[in-house]
Amino acid sequence: DGSIPQRIGSALAAHLFKGNPYYSMATSRKLRVMISSRCMDHFPGPEGTPLTDVRRELKKSIEAEKLFGAKAFEVWINEDAEALDHSKDSWDACLKQVRDCDVLIVLFNGHAGWAKEAGDIGICHAEYIEGLNTSRSKVRLIELPTCAATSDVAQTDRNNRFKSFKQSESAFRGGIVPQDVPTLGAVENQAQRLGGL
């Protein structure tokens, strides 16, 4: 029940702040993260895991992280979005997600993604550009092993434009992820041998 001063303080606070917009508490929202990459490509190679599965696992892992005991992140991946065809509407919807997110994680494997027109840039390329144009500081690029070559000339051209653009930017890069990615246990064992843990 609390002491008399506590009850008076609570009653006074309720009276003073009730309905007063100047004294209302700020409401916090979760940080919005978007993961941009191809979905159907495989990581780390043709026999590896589809990037869709990698993206879902990343989403689950990021959303499980807590800050001061509260879940702090909300992750958007297009696999969980409302189904749209490859039209102007789905293109615009993806770019809107880029503008609205607080952090954009680009999983770069050199594949630019689908395009509205044969000579255009791909959706992954467009998302990367939109992120840099919206706020460079929110973009994080993780370089994966390069995707396999394609016989589609227009797609090859898009991929080459994307690779050239990425090379011209000085965005934060998380490094190149090798094909033979060690397990967390192997990394911890190596760190212990070196006296790091």
PLM features per residue range, with description:
Residues A81-A83, P145, L184:
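Short, solvent-exposed coil/turn elements at secondary-structure transition points
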Residues E82, G119, G175:
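Conserved short-loop catalytic and cofactor-binding motifs
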